[in-house]
Amino acid sequence: MDPEGFTSGLFRWNPTRALVQAPPPVPPPLQQQPVTPQTAAFGMRLGGLEGLFGPYGIRFYTAAKIAELGFTASTLVGMKDEELEEMMNSLSHIFRWELLVGERYGIKAAVRAERRRLQEEEEEESSRRRHLLLSAAGDSGTHHALDALSQEGLSEEPVQQQDQTDAAGNNGGGGSGYWDAGQGKMKKQQQQRRRKKPMLTSVETDEDVNEGEDDDGMDNGNGGSGLGTERQREHPFIVTEPGEVARGKKNGLDYLFHLYEQCREFLLQVQTIAKDRGEKCPTKVTNQVFRYAKKSGASYINKPKMRHYVHCYALHCLDEEASNALRRAFKERGENVGSWRQACYKPLVNIACRHGWDIDAVFNAHPRLSIWYVPTKLRQLCHLERNNAVAAAAALVGGISCTGSSTSGRGGCGGDDLRF
């Protein structure tokens, strides 16, 4: 059999025919089919899941079953990863529908991508609003004032209202005086914050002298956690005996110790809420507890004040008799609460001495003190007293050895020249 004949018979090539043939007609553009009411209603039944899961390879039947369980795209975006796992497990158990491994990862990836998209939209919207405010302000000086006021948020609203009325009275309703006054007020508040920072962070020395007159002054400023809201000023504390009720616009020490018991109750409530939500449970009184107390209406409980007197409460818990005796003695002498607060350190240092200078162990061993952090000054005083005790013991041992050497006639430390 001739192979050449087979190939020539199979492939017939006619170049002239290829030139004569006309090109195929261009197909008409595809018209997009209108969305029927049935299709729109079906998409609404999915709750936006078709747009959320579309690019991630999740089967349509899986999305439909998730929608049957009552979940929407907004619901899934607000859920945590553990809750998404529970949702997928419920889907498998209820409908006996086995999810693919890629679908499980795809659902989580889609939710994370949607969260990022929403966050970017919020940031763009906020930047756009700020740009509009800046462009509408005018000159450069107004730019700085407006930007600072917008960043401060609600904390500058009373300042704006007050300065607006002042500017309206002084300038006949002009706008330039309003912004200048707002900027000047802001600079004054920033200077006050700078002056308050070293007072709050340094070891309490001079502030305790005037504590009887103005005890809660630093608690009502903006240095605490209450930026943006004005805390109601509380009456100052005075030294009172156990069971004595303070008269006038004063608060006694029994009321102060009662605040610590309230903080303990708020901590228990925060722990219960955190366990129900599956979140990290705090074991000590932290900023989260103070924020919860403020939201619950107990704005008189604030972090600076509670940390300021925590060692006084510790003495009350560890040795109530010594605490009561100290209160009676200072009440008889007419001392203010600042002097009483300073005097509470020494009994605690003595208690730490009996426990090997480990003040942290003393706090953690007590059920009512284990939720509080040890004050830095108390820890420093214990460390200082321990060093002094070690140095005194070493000097005593050295003196005894030197005295023994001089009496035996071997010289050594100089004998009679030492003075103890």
Swiss-Prot record:
Any single Pfam family the record assigns to this protein:
C_LFY_FLO
Please give the chief subcellular localization of this protein.
nucleus
Q: Where is the composition biased (Basic residues)?
A: 185-198
DNA-binding region in chain numbering: 233-237, 302-309, 373-376
Coiled-coil segments on the chain, per record:
108-133
For whether the record's keyword set contains Nucleotide-binding, the answer is no
Task: Region Disordered: list its residue ranges.
Answer: 153-231
Effect the entry attributes to changing residue 8 to R = In strain: cv. Jl-1
| Keywords linked to the UniProt accession | Activator, Coiled coil, Developmental protein, Differentiation, DNA-binding, Flowering, Nucleus, Transcription, Transcription regulation
Instruction: Give the UniProt tissue specificity note.
Output: Expressed uniformly throughout the young floral primordia.
- InterPro entries linked: FLO/LFY_C (IPR035209), FLO_LFY (IPR002910), Floricaula/leafy_C_sf (IPR038276), LFY_SAM (IPR035079)
Effect of substituting residue 234 to K: In lfy-4; decreased in vitro DNA-binding affinities and leafy phenotype
Query: Motif Nuclear localization signal residues?
Result: 115-122
Q: Name one GO molecular function term.
A: protein homodimerization activity
This protein's GO CC annotations: nucleus
Role noted for this protein: Probable transcription factor that promotes early floral meristem identity in synergy with APETALA1. Is required subsequently for the transition of an inflorescence meristem into a floral meristem, by an immediate upstream regulation of the ABC classes of floral homeotic genes. Activates directly APETALA1, CAULIFLOWER and AGAMOUS, and indirectly APETALA3 and PISTILLATA with the cooperation of UFO.
Entry's family note: Belongs to the FLO/LFY family.
Q: What else is known?
A: Mutations in the LEAFY gene result in the complete transformation of the first few flowers into leaves with associated shoots.
According to the record's subunit comment, the protein's assembly and interactions are: Forms homodimer when associated to DNA. Interacts with SYD and BRM.
In Swiss-Prot or TrEMBL terms, this protein is called Protein LEAFY
Q: Which organism is it from?
A: Arabidopsis thaliana (Mouse-ear cress)
**What does the organism's lineage look like at the top?**
Eukaryota, Viridiplantae, Streptophyta, Embryophyta, Tracheophyta
- Gene expressing this chain: LFY
